Amino acid sequence: MSTPNEPEKPGIIDAFKSLKMSDFAHMVHHPCFKESLITSVVCGLGVGCIHLFLRAPISRAANWGFGTYFGMSIVSWEGCNYRKQLETNNFNIKITEAAEKTPKHRSSRSAQEIDEGFNE
């Protein structure tokens, strides 16, 4: 519980209230959206069909298919975001290492001294 001096922490209802339709419209441009959607749909259909082939009732097979779709979409989304984060971190490390290897002063002589050396 918060004291009178502390602001209240936003809850899950506040998070849902802050969502806009434009947030969902731009979701398809997220790099992990396509991979997550395809993986979850294929897994959900696969598990649902397997349950149908095993002579489960249609409602139970649909429940298993939807549950698998929902679970795999979360797992795939988080896995993709984790891989993207690792790639970004590795890229930043390589940039830092390359910047450290580049000499700050390539030559202690001025450009004019270098040109005079070639003309001799």
Curated annotation (Swiss-Prot):
It is a single-pass membrane protein. GO terms for biological process: mitochondrial cytochrome c oxidase assembly. Residues 55-120 are mitochondrial matrix. Keywords: Membrane, Mitochondrion, Mitochondrion inner membrane, Transit peptide, Transmembrane, Transmembrane helix. PANTHER family: CYTOCHROME C OXIDASE ASSEMBLY PROTEIN COX20, MITOCHONDRIAL, CYTOCHROME C OXIDASE PROTEIN 20. Belongs to the COX20 family. It comes from the Eukaryota. GO terms for cellular component: mitochondrial inner membrane; mitochondrion. InterPro entries: Cox20. Its main location: mitochondrion. Signal peptide: none annotated. It comes from Schizosaccharomyces pombe (strain 972 / ATCC 24843). Involved in the assembly of the cytochrome oxidase complex. Required for the maturation and subsequent assembly of the mitochondrially encoded cox2, the precursor of subunit 2 of cytochrome oxidase. Residues 98-120 are annotated as: Disordered. Disulfide bonds: none annotated. The chain crosses the membrane at residues 37-54. This is Cytochrome c oxidase assembly protein cox20, mitochondrial. It is found in: Mitochondrion inner membrane.
